[in-house]
Amino acid sequence: MNVEDEVDLMKKMIIGRKIGMTQVFAEDGAAIPVTAIEVEPSVITQKKTVEKDGYDAIQLGYGRIKQNKATKPLQGHFAKADKGCFRILKEMRCDQIQEYELGQEITLDIFESGEMVDITGTTKGKGFAGVIKRHGFRGGRSSHGSMFHRAPGSIGASAYPSRVFKGKKLPGQMGNKQKTVKNLMIWSLRPERNLILIRGAVPGARNGYLFIKQSAKA
């Protein structure tokens, strides 16, 4: 199977690890902010079929770990591919499942410079936050007899509806949520170092795991 066929079947998705941000310079001298993502080869650890599972999909493993770091059930699961144990597993739908083999490696060669991708990651956790920090509320006056400054104010009426509507913006956990940023451009590929440079910022902290797939709107 050649690379072009593999790209079509894979829908161009791979797993990576965020290294950090830097800048590169365009031909006209403009400084371009980019995010460096380490993309080691992902390994197919499982094949799912319509007959057995109700749909066709492959499971990718990323980030090798020692065997004793995986649970016994996962050790048995990984043994089928015979490529070691992995920290991250990600399932992906595909059309022609018969074209794949257990243990097959997927590399960053499926992408090209200039392509648009959607990147999913886990945002930085900020802990418990109030409505001003979490939702950008304006807050109350600082003086002239104001009785509230950073409080949210009324969250609903008493007699009717006698409840707080779902989705009401309130204080609570900020960050540490899965987020997808769409239509980011691949600035360049560095296969010799297993790196992808993405123009702009991506979700998450350094060393966070990212799922990179072909943009749905490209």
Curated annotation (Swiss-Prot):
Give a GO molecular function annotation for the protein.
Answer: rRNA binding
Q: Which family does it belong to?
A: Belongs to the universal ribosomal protein uL3 family.
- SS bonds (residue pairs): none
Pfam families to which the protein is assigned, alphabetical: Ribosomal_L3
Q: Which Gene3D superfamilies match?
A: 3.30.160.810, Translation factors
Protein's recorded name: Large ribosomal subunit protein uL3
SUPFAM superfamilies with a match to the protein in the record? Translation proteins
This protein's species is Syntrophus aciditrophicus (strain SB)
Q: Which domain of life is it from?
A: Bacteria
- What's a single GO BP term from this record? translation
Q: Which gene encodes it?
A: rplC
Instruction: State whether keyword Magnesium applies.
Output: no
What's this chain's function? One of the primary rRNA binding proteins, it binds directly near the 3'-end of the 23S rRNA, where it nucleates assembly of the 50S subunit.
